[in-house]
Amino acid sequence: NKRAYDSIGECMRKKIIIIMTAIVLFGGFIAGYRNINQKYPARKVETAEKGESLEFLDGVKISASGVKWLSTEEQAAIYENSGIDTSKVNYDTKIIEVNVCLKNTTEEEKEVPITYLSLETTGVGTAISRELLMGNSEHYSSMVEKLEPGEEKVVTYPYEICSIWFHKKDWKNIEMRSFWMTFASYPDKIVLYL
């Protein structure tokens, strides 16, 4: 009888220790989670519709002014000029050209690095295609744009979209998807809708 009582008591002590340990671990998890959220708060999203401008760099405004999906023939010419042999690629691609307007609002010359501009859609993001840019420099703008005081300039950049990034059904309707430009993601995400 005493053994059974000791066995029950031992079992209860183990359960109490396990429950207390779980409570302490859970409390530590919650405290850590709150600490991380205070150090790294949720990002704010600043958006602009097509034609609206946002501050890109100090004194430089940017706005999306146009989008063009290249035809198969136009795309083939761009790849050929870039020296890219697409016959060895086992997936489809599309090239989207994005026009952005840069405006220097200062009284001094500005050099604007464009490498920050990314093209995004739900679940996928891509940078300016340097290979296409360099191989077609007469058609596309530079990776660093120079702007005189008060100058406004429309520049064009190519972005390559690959079928392997999407489900087949999504790829069939790729040109119908919503795309946007971003140039900052944290602490503030800045979005230019196309």
Which functions belong to the PLM regions below?
Residues 1-11:
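Short, Lys/Arg-enriched N-terminal segments with co-localized hydrophobic residues
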